[in-house]
Design a protein with these regions (language model features):
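Transmembrane helix-bundle signature of multi-pass membrane transporters/permeases
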Residues: 40-48, 77, 169-177, 206, ...
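Transmembrane alpha-helices of multi-pass small-molecule transport proteins
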Residues: 42-57, 107
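Transmembrane helix-bundle signature of multi-pass secondary active exporters and lipid flippases
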Residues: 179-182
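Juxtamembrane transmembrane-helix boundary motif
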Residues: 1-9, 30-31, 36, 56-145, ...
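Membrane-interface alpha-helices at helix entry/exit sites of multi-pass transporters
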Residues: 35-42, 65-71, 162-173
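Short helix-coil transition sites and intra-membrane helix breaks within transmembrane domains
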Residues: 13-22, 142-150
């Protein structure tokens, strides 16, 4: 099953440059049964490998902007470290709340894909210096969920740079690649990567991303990106629902156990009273 998941996700990444973490994390949690931190770490390495394959198609065509890429990385890398640390700290409690937060973050990042580009190029040129600061929360979000570099990075570049769409996509893919490589190292250090599942994803993902890159110029990218963002949004909502359901079940179980313990403690004084009465009779 993981082979098929890897192929489908990689095909979408090759065609549009987005969807890696937004699809992989919900799939690994809902289908693979992985905990949140392991799903994010595994998705990070998988997304990094996919972008490593897709990046040359844009680098060799010089469809990226070095200056804007540098600004994005200056802000995003510190945020990436913070987001990773926060995820690991929350995951130590093994709480369904982590899954709920992941679902909310993934849903929000997918919803951003539906925003339109501002038409004021003068605004974009004058305010591009803010890219580093605006990229910081993208790094935090990516470190926590492995997603967002694609959708959020693209939206940021569309509105704070005057680049043409082809350069936006190329710059964003390289941005996501660097974040994925650094994020993979962070998560690997914390031991939050499932190697067997990762290899299965890669076996299906490598041919998928190659096929997607080969057909990228023949497919209407805009419509496909909207479709992928919509599916990712629904997957994020499903993750929230699954986390809420698990949280309710765990609370109900805890309440039942508490009630059982209270019942046992309630009967203990009666046993002590019987012992005192027996002693008096003797």
């Amino acid at each position: 099953m993981n082979f098929i998941i890897g192929f489908i996700i990689a095909l979408g990444v090759g065609l549009t440059g987005i969807g890696g973490g937004s699809f992989t994390v919900p799939a690994l949690v809902l289908i693979g049964g992985l905990p949140g931190n392991a799903a994010v770490g595994t998705a990070f390495v998988f997304a990094g490998a996919l972008r490593l394959i897709a990046a040359p198609f844009y680098v060799f065509g010089k469809n990226f902007h070095k200056g804007y890429l540098r600004l994005l990385l200056q802000g995003a890398i510190p945020g990436l470290l913070i987001g990773t640390i926060v995820l690991q700290l929350l995951s130590k409690k093994n709480s369904p709340v982590v899954i709920i937060i992941l679902g909310i973050v993934l849903t929000a990042s997918s919803a951003v894909s539906f925003t339109k580009r501002m038409q004021n190029r003068e605004f974009a040129r004058k305010n591009s210096r803010w890219l580093a600061w605006l990229a910081f929360p993208i790094g935090v979000e990516a470190g926590f969920s492995s997603a967002g570099a694609g959708a959020l990075g693209t939206t940021l570049l569309m509105n704070y740079s005057e680049m043409p769409p082809s350069q936006v996509v190329g710059t964003d893919i390289l941005f996501g690649l660097v974040l994925a490589v650094i994020g993979s190292a962070f998560h690997w250090k914390f031991g939050a990567i499932n190697a067997p599942i990762l290899w299965q994803l890669l076996i299906g993902g490598v041919p998928g991303v190659l096929l997607g890159c080969a057909f990228a110029r023949k497919v209407p990218a805009r419509n496909l990106r909207v479709a992928i963002a919509l599916i990712a949004l629904l997957a994020g909502l499903q993750l929230v629902w699954d986390g809420v359901r698990t949280l309710r079940a765990s609370r109900a179980e805890r309440s039942a156990l508490t009630g059982s313990d209270t019942g046992q403690n309630y009967h203990q004084p009666d046993e002590s009273l019987e012992a005192v009465r027996s002693a008096r009779l003797v």
